[in-house]
């Protein structure tokens, strides 16, 4: 099994990697008291994705996993779960236990153990839209596949299982036995925390069927975005400390402040939208257990994630997300084109090095916020209305368009979606010629910024190469 490259060139140039750091690195999390659930499966698909009989996993990926040497499988996991108190910023207590549950996990893993890098990224499905939604996968799937990660989606919340758009309604034949309410006796998603912990435990200490086909996990990373990031923050603060199963928790675009006394490593990222919405007022300094990055120009719901997941949303849920570009019902063309996924790719690799070798991820500059009492928070911007500060990928440091994290709806009912989508406004030809007299000048500027991002640890080499290739192909000026 190989360890993902943690931006070796960047960390060496930055002087981060030292022999003493590796020698004194903390050990990964030890097996906890969380029970291993009973695993059944893989649940066979009886129809192809898109078939109206719905005999396949909900949100089955349309990516060509075979080309990467991967397979997608769905399993049911079940057992008994506790309910917990979740006091603000404090460890909770068990209210009661022995609540029966059964839910599902979706596993995307290498076929060959030789390709597995030893790390499983376990995503808490977002259920804002009342169905399971895999945001982190939609952003970082390419890097996860290329670097040999396992990705696991967990249906942790009752909303995703029991709602009118949930799994049971979508395919009664496939999902009729799932239950996150103990027969209707438990509400408020109280069993979600144990369902999530036990799903992770099934990867490291399987009971019955091994959902990883015998592959051994070295590192478990929990992740979630937006709504599920908020649930994950509560989990990190109040439930996970009772019985740690994850080596690290990656919180993307959401959540309240993290406790400063947590022993599990937490890596938090925030788009420009999230910084201006609420995260600027919740900023915390980096420590040996907490890292926080802000990404300039990135939106909560960006163009890349939309293009990846919207066809599947339409196929399985029958609804579309906010359209990208000028056709969206927003004041400005919608959905930032800043590749937020590139920063998340670097984050995952850093987490592995942080957990296994004790290599501290780099500190990132913060967005230049001047007033958090306004909504959105007030921040410094340049002449092109691009925000200052934060991690600055080439899309904002060498701009050909105005990418921002905040937009406004044409009508009040569209305001929230438009705000989260941000803006993507291409520069006109005159502006492009003023900025970049020649195409070569533009490409050189992109190369310089991208090389610096790699040295700083905010970009992995494959994404740097993709950035430069895109600049070379761009019709600029």
Language-model features, listed with the residues they occupy:
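Secretory targeting and sorting signals
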Residues: 1-26
């Amino acid at each position: 099994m190989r360890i993902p490259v943690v931006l070796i060139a960047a960390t060496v140039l930055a002087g981060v990697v030292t022999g003493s750091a590796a020698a004194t690195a903390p050990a990964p999390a030890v097996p906890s008291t969380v029970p291993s659930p009973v695993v059944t499966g893989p649940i066979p698909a009886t129809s192809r994705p898109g078939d109206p009989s719905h005999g396949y996993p909900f949100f089955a990926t349309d990516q060509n996993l075979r080309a990467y040497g991967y397979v997608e499988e769905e399993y049911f996991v079940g057992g008994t779960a506790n309910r917990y108190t979740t006091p603000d910023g404090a460890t909770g207590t068990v209210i009661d236990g022995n609540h029966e549950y059964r839910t599902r996990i979706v596993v995307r893993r290498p076929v060959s153990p030789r390709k597995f890098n030893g790390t499983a990224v376990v995503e808490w499905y977002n259920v804002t839209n009342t169905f399971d939604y895999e945001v982190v996968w939609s952003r970082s799937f390419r890097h996860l596949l290329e670097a040999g990660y396992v990705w696991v989606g967990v249906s942790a919340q009752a909303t995703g299982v029991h709602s009118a758009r949930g799994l049971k309604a979508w395919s009664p034949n496939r999902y009729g036995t799932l239950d996150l309410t103990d027969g209707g006796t438990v509400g408020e998603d109280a069993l979600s925390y144990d369902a999530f912990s036990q799903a992770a435990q099934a990867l490291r200490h399987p009971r019955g069927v091994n959902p990883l086909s015998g592959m051994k996990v070295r590192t478990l990373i929990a992740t979630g975005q937006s709504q599920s990031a908020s649930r994950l923050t509560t989990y990190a603060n109040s439930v996970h400390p009772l019985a740690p199963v994850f080596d690290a928790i990656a919180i993307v675009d959401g959540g309240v402040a993290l406790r400063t006394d947590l022993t599990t490593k937490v890596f938090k990222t925030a788009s420009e939208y999230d910084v201006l919405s609420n995260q600027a007022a919740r900023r915390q300094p980096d420590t040996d257990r907490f890292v926080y990055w802000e990404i300039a120009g990135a939106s909560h719901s960006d163009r890349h994630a939309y293009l990846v997941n919207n066809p599947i949303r339409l196929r399985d849920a029958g609804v579309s997300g906010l359209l990208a570009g000028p056709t969206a019902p927003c004041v400005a063309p919608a959905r930032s084109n800043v590749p937020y996924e590139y920063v998340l790719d670097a984050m995952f690799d850093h987490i592995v090095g942080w957990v296994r070798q004790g290599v501290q991820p780099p500190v990132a500059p913060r967005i230049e916020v001047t007033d958090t009492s306004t909504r959105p928070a007030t921040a410094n911007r340049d002449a092109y209305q691009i925000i200052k500060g934060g991690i600055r990928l080439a899309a904002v440091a060498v701009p050909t368009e105005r990418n921002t994290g905040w937009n406004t709806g044409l009508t009040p009912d569209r305001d929230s979606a438009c705000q989260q989508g941000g803006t993507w406004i291409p520069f006109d030809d005159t502006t492009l010629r003023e900025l970049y007299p020649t195409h070569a000048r533009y490409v050189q500027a992109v190369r310089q910024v991208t090389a610096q991002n790699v040295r700083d640890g905010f970009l992995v080499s494959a994404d740097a190469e993709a950035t430069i290739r895109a600049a070379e192909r761009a019709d600029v000026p």
